From Swiss-Prot:
Belongs to the UPF0312 family. Type 1 subfamily. This is UPF0312 protein PP_4981. It comes from Pseudomonas putida (strain ATCC 47054 / DSM 6125 / CFBP 8728 / NCIMB 11950 / KT2440). Its main location: periplasm. It comes from the Bacteria. The keyword Signal applies. One of its GO terms (cellular component) is periplasmic space. Disulfide bonds: none annotated. Keywords: Periplasm, Signal. Residues 1-23 form the signal peptide. It is found in: Periplasm. HAMAP family: UPF0312 (MF_00780).
Length: 192
């Protein structure tokens, strides 16, 4: 009787395990310049300033059969901001805005992924920036996955969101500069 019970338990466990999707782990390919964290903010309501953060790292888990089980974590060095204008970058990095000396890091950790279409999802998580943690939702698009020419496997995504800087204790220079658009493009290398 004990043998039959154990065999049934083992078979049930095997069937349950086979039915569960296994998310693969990916490292964001920043070193190969296949990942970007770009931003855009209004300049006096007349135009937009575009920039990027050059120093960040992260990883994500992904299973195309079960995207809701995906997770992502990104760490960013705020002093790595770049807008192609050294004096402006210095001002944005100052205590007037990002205060990168006091707040050198920003971090996003997902808490949920909700599919919104065949290749789209809302990725919600906690964004910590300027010493404040707030929930943020990114609109994400799955670009594709497959083998690369170097024998590895990759998956790629784009994600966008708009942040209200006041929510993070950052005072923009005027009413037209209170929101910041983030556009993230990542390609991850599957970890073995």
């Amino acid at each position: 009787m004990l043998k039959k019970t154990f065999a049934a338990l083992a078979l049930g466990t095997a069937l349950l395990s086979a039915g569960q999707a296994m998310a693969a782990e990916y490292k964001i390919d920043k070193e190969g310049q296949h990942a970007f964290v770009d931003w855009k903010i209004s300049h006096l309501g007349y135009s937009f300033i575009h920039g990027t953060f050059k120093d960040f790292d992260g990883n994500f888990s992904w299973d195309s059969a079960k995207p809701e089980a995906s997770k992502i974590s990104v760490d960013l060095k705020t002093a790595s901001l770049w807008s192609n204008h050294a004096e402006r970058d210095k001002h944005i990095a100052s205590a007037d805005f990002l205060d990168v000396k006091k707040y050198p890091d920003a971090k996003f950790v997902s808490t949920s992924v909700k599919s919104t279409g065949d290749k789209t999802a809302d990725v919600t998580g906690d964004l910590t920036m300027h010493g404040v943690t707030k929930p943020v939702t990114f609109k994400a698009t799955f670009n594709g996955e497959g083998k690369d020419p170097w024998g590895g496997e990759r998956a790629g995504f784009n994600a966008t969101t708009t942040l209200n800087l006041n929510d993070f204790g950052i005072k923009g220079p005027g009413a037209t500069s209170q929101t910041l658009d983030l556009d993230i493009s990542v390609e991850g290398v599957k970890q073995k």
